[in-house]
Amino acid sequence: MVYYIDPNTGREYSIDPTKRGAVTEPLITGIGNRFDIEEDYLADDEIGVKVKMNTLKDKYEGCLLGLACGDAVGTTVEFKPRGSFAPITDMVGGGPFDLDVGQWTDDTSMALCLAESLLAQNGFDAKDQMDKYLKWYNDGYMSSKGYCFDIGRTVSSALGKYSLHKNPYAGSTEPRTAGNGSIMRLAAIPLYYLSNLEKTIHFAGESSRTTHGAEEAVESAKLFAVLIRMALLGHSKQDILLKNEYYSNMDNVTSFYANHIHDKLNNEKVIR
């Protein structure tokens, strides 16, 4: 028995190569939303002929490793004024936290906390996520240096509120707090909920609200989750970046940036 994933829906089908043209539903049984398969196949190829693509495992690893590698590369110029440095073309470490080559910052630490929470709780659990963020902040959990050496003000404020009131949705709703912290850690949400678009969108927003509750941050997290999901399902870069039917609130995000992007670019003088 072999399997393929329909790139239009993310659904898995089993194929019996001895019965040409026979496609069987429902999907392979798995644990939660983690697919118990090693290969996927083009949906429009002749039934029974295996066409090896990048495996889902490769894509998942690439998504998380790309996040961490980008973080480790970018830390070299974090907080430097735009245009004040030569382009970075390799992973060299250093930066404001004097990191070794390959060490990541708070962004990847929080991404790992979110991923671990989804696996440990078999799904979305806002309280467990905040507990893990606190463990990172207090004990260095998932930190590349063994301790928390940097934390954004918005996240710090949310963790402080959670410590006092135990409401996991502690993110400020003030527009001025709509930073990108909840997007940088987001990848595990579309990875875990790949087979369900509605859950991907919903829990992307909920994952933002724990620390970044401003509408701009929440809606942007939802959109970014959809873009990651489309990439995982094999959509082209052009399709991913075009306005699409998968995310009904695209106009909300577009209007945010149409109204505020120039102000943000003018005000953000340093790399964050």
What are these regions (language model features)?
Residues V2-R272:
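Structured, active/binding-site neighborhoods that engage oxygen-rich ligands
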